[in-house]
Amino acid sequence: MTQQPQAKYRYDYRAPDYQITDIDLTFDLDAEKTVVTAISQAVRHGAPDAPLRLDGEDLTLVSIHVNDAPWTAYKEEEGALIISDLPERFTLRIVNEISPAANTALEGLYQSGDALCTQCEAEGFRHITWYLDRPDVLARFTTKIIADKSKYPFLLSNGNRVAQGELENGRHWVQWQDPFPKPCYLFALVAGDFDVLRDTFTTRSGREVALELYVDRGNLDRAPWAMISLKNSMKWDETRFGLEYDLDIYMIVAVDFFNMGAMENKGLNIFNSKYVLARTDTATDKDYLDIERVIGHEYFHNWTGNRVTCRDWFQLSLKEGLTVFRDQEFSSDLGSRAVNRISNVRTMRGLQFAEDASPMAHPIRPDKVIEMNNFYTLTVYEKGAEVIRMIHTLLGEKNFQKGMQLYFERHDGSAATCDDFVQAMEDASNVDLSHFRRWYSQSGTPIVTVKDDYNPETEQYTLTISQRTPATADQAEKQPLHIPFAIELYDNEGNVIPLQKGGHPVNAVLNVTQAEQTFTFDNVYFQPVPALLCEFSAPVKLEYKWSDQQLTFLMRHARNDFSRWDAAQSLLATYIKLNVARHQQGQPLSLPVHVADAFRAVLLDEKIDPALAAEILTLPSANEIAELFEVIDPIAIAQVREALTRTLAAELADEFLAIYNANHLDEYRVDHGDIGKRTLRNACLRFLAFGETELANTLVSKQYRDANNMTDALAALSAAVAAQLPCRDTLMQEYDDKWHQDGLVMDKWFILQSTSPAENVLETVRGLLKHRSFSMSNPNRIRSLIGAFAGSNPAAFHAQDGSGYQFLVEMLTDLNSRNPQVASRLIEPLIRLKRYDDKRQEKMRAALEQLKGLENLSGDLYEKITKALA
């Protein structure tokens, strides 16, 4: 590495010495050499002698002019162009060259298949031209694109199309104008040949907006669901938040080579094709719902992210936490609120809590960053959304919406901070959030311990609630947080007991603000069964000594669907922890009859929503289970999880088969009732696959071959792989033969291969690096094969001999120079070495030291490796 990357600190923020009000861009496009001309209107705000320091990387400078005169008062440094002796107001003209085809990092302007496209968030615009690449510089963009018409018939950018024309030699040009000032991370350009799905949306004020969805030629029949999702998003944002779209056109382009999921560029969203393309035979129910969610997320950014952006990147959760909350609400309003909440909580418990306990622990508003791309995290996004949800819980929907309106009134068209958002919520609601603000600055997962006491003589029930947040890699000292803690109390017949104190009703959301607090409730005539942390009202770990009877009672009687699922999770957690300890001592699995009976009751409950039943019957993932332990034993977890599956499969075989047969559907519809039935049926098939082999093999093979949709086909294939059924290899080969030319569909196959419990899985993964459908230059392929192996097959990745670690080192060595952003995502399982036993830690540390010694180690990897080794 040439020099050690330097950290940036939130407290060092200062406004820029110069602002750019308008920028006129011209691109003379060619994959090998593109000429960029940037004409900026600049104004000095700093000291008269302050130089203009522009960001730029991998650029070839051609010329600089100030007010049309050639300018020589400048110098180039690594990553910067410093221009001196400037007047207070001036026009700056910079011409430079770039090579999109050589840009394998996929930041800035790059080649995706035969198309050219951009990705500028967080700091990609500096790979296009020299500029003030920071989010607090908002300018109006005009963009002219010139290109060969046969290669690039469509030339797209932000805003509205204002002019176009033909040129000699088969070339043409299009000019775009975006009337809304924006930071350069929201700039976008796409050039290519596409099929286009067109539609319109009429806003509530009566404006007609043109909707255009661009997909690769031949994929038009996979675009309609994305268009439906976009129109639903636009309607929902008007109805729920009162927010209307503001341009004449809204475009989405699907590209195959993309580091992230999607990007909210103003008026021109660029999407990973994974979150656009869907057809019954290529996409699962989950794919359809993910497309709906991500289309919604990027559309909702038009107001929460674009119209109001971030002052600096430390404030990223201002737009992302808020917009994830909005997309979660969108999915919940359109679908099943309980199932969506369960999905969000699985992510928090299985993945975000692990991030809090890792060397990369940070608050939702980080204080220190080396590489900004490393902070597009579950903490900033998902925990950030939980913080917004807590504000919503404390204020209520009406006051929350008043806060949103005030936030837009104050900050529309500007760059704001997290404090600005909280202040707007406070001022609109008159609710004091000063203590609550600690959620923005304190990292880690709070542990809330609850003890209860019932006094039959006074008919009082008391909860003693204490909180502590363990020290994290970035913060040793922790303070008590303001935790909204939702509860319900049930009598022995399953009725909710009204909460009272001193003759007055008590809010079911308790405000826990101290290290320890006591809450007493009157007129409780029987020992109640408590439902605690209802709806996961705060992102905390809960400690309470549940009895099995309490949990099975809640599974049956809780009026809140989330509480029913959560009780099942707690019941499973009890016996998973017990059996991991037994496994480590060489003892067999132990599961009391009443646990299986509790799950049998779910299967026999005719009133339960099938989607909820499926969630209750889905065992926690290996990653969720890992969070139950201080020291993770991945092999014991995998073996106990499989033994538990086989035990339930044997105990409930008749019920699983009956429910499986009862939920057959002839037609495929993306309908929440049908999705629930398919999910339940496939959850049953998963258990049946671990039952009697001959029946399992027959059922799975038949479902795979009879399936008229990808959901059922993939569920069968996944069951065959998980249970290692005799039909596995034949079915996997059939899938490969049918779909090998479709990368997105093959990603599902690569994930099944790389997460297989087979002993030779690493050997298989190594072999698949040479598969005809695999490419080390495509992030989706890399994530589905290498990423899934390292992140979702812990038993194989953490093999005792260290072979999994060595494999990842080899892959990261390649990706370090090819695509540092993707490399940085893949290293996550390796940096969490302190959660494992000494022998594994030693091997993981050696692997990290090996990577640290790489020549030209990227800043992305350097930051994570040095924190892990600290």
What are these model-predicted stretches?
Residues M1-V35, Y110-Q119, Y131, P135, ...:
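N-terminal, polar/Ser/Thr-rich
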Residues T37-A42, G56, E88-N103, F141-K149, ...:
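Short, hydrophobic/aromatic-enriched beta-strand segments in well-ordered soluble domains
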Residues T37-D58, W130-D133, A139-D148, D419, ...:
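Surface-exposed beta-strand/loop patches in extracellular or lumenal glycoproteins
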Residues H45-S112, D133, E168-G170, V174, ...:
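A surface-exposed beta-strand-loop module
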Residues T60-N67, D432-H435, T445-L532, K577, ...:
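Beta-strand-rich binding/interaction modules
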Residues V95-R198, D561-R564:
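Extended, low-hydrophobicity, Ser/Thr/Pro/Gly-biased non-transmembrane segments
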Residues W176, R204-T458, T462-L463:
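Hydrophobic alpha-helical and helix-loop surface patches within well-folded domains
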Residues G350, T377, D522-A870:
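Long, ordered, helix-rich scaffold segments
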